[in-house]
Design a protein with these regions (language model features):
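Beta-strand-loop-alpha "switch" segments that mediate conformational coupling across diverse proteins
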Residues: 161-166, 170-204, 215
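Phosphate-binding/switch loop-helix module in NTP-utilizing enzymes
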Residues: 65-117
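Conserved C-terminal guanine-recognition region of P-loop GTPase G domains, centered on the G4
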Residues: 115-116, 136-155
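Walker A/P-loop NTP-binding active-site region of P-loop NTPases
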Residues: 1-60
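Well-ordered beta-strand positions
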Residues: 90, 123-127, 181-183
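Conserved beta-strand segments of the P-loop GTPase G domain that flank and frequently precede/overlap
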Residues: 2-4, 33, 67-68, 92-94, ...
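Acidic-aromatic/histidine active-site loop/patch
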Residues: 1, 50-51, 75, 147-150, ...
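Conserved Switch II/interswitch segment of TRAFAC-class P-loop GTPases
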Residues: 97-103, 122-140, 164-166
Length: 223
């Protein structure tokens, strides 16, 4: 499952991290891969040292493991993915921004290799956006980009802070590109701040908050 954003600062890393945690808690043996080359953040959010130096992945708990792809490791990603697929039930990949995706899929540079793999072999891609005007513009651009290419994964949309999403913008966006799911994710600054302070996931620090329940709902549907 690839997790990427229509633009920067839409919470895709937080979503990928918490979905991986929820899947692990549901009993799925789960690997979370940080392939956001421009701004890797998962190790920082979890206060982990030298994750990028691991040959394969680092086990965090019985069902959750973490990996970080670097330029040096990108060439061997296909082999890593094959081995991981034989060991894990579920693999989440933080892709960072998906802007200019069609160009990336024809690019032979190292930074595009994971996106190419996801486009050809993943089951799902979850795109994150917000209700901010500029983010909505970037999302529309991405959906137009998607309509011009053929990729294997089902595409879903997670809209952060979006209580009015369906009422206001739903018909415009869904007519641009068909989405398998559209999820509305509530904003909870307190829960997010607590998770960042404790360097962990929402399931560990605020299990009953609406935001955590939203993550659990998504994980249940896509696993």
């Amino acid at each position: 499952i690839g997790v990427g954003s229509a633009s920067h600062s839409t919470g895709n890393t937080v979503l990928a991290l918490n979905l991986a945690q929820e899947s692990a808690l549901l009993g799925m043996k789960t690997l979370l891969i940080d392939a956001n080359f421009q701004a890797p953040a998962i190790a920082t959010l979890l206060d982990l040292r030298k994750v990028s130096e691991e040959n394969k992945w680092r086990d965090m708990s019985e069902n959750l493991s973490i990996s970080e792809i670097t330029q040096e490791k990108a060439a061997g990603f296909n082999a890593l993915a094959v081995e991981a697929a034989s060991y894990f039930d579920l693999i989440y990949i933080d892709l960072g921004t998906l802007a200019n995706l069609s160009s990336d899929l024809t690019d032979r540079r190292w930074a595009s290799q994971v996106k190419i793999w996801v486009a050809n072999l993943a089951q799902n891609i979850v795109i994150t956006s917000t209700t901010d005007l500029l983010q909505q513009r970037r999302l529309k651009d991405l959906q137009q980009d998607l309509s011009k290419i053929s990729i294997r994964p089902n595409i879903s949309l997670a809209v952060l802070s979006a209580s009015d999403y369906r009422k206001r913008d739903g018909p415009i966006l869904t007519s641009t590109y068909p989405m398998s799911h559209i999820w509305q994710i509530p904003f909870d600054a307190r829960a997010c701040s607590l998770a960042m302070k404790e360097r962990t996931t929402l399931a560990q620090v605020s299990a009953k908050c609406p935001l955590r329940k939203a993550f659990l709902n998504i994980a249940t549907q896509i696993t």
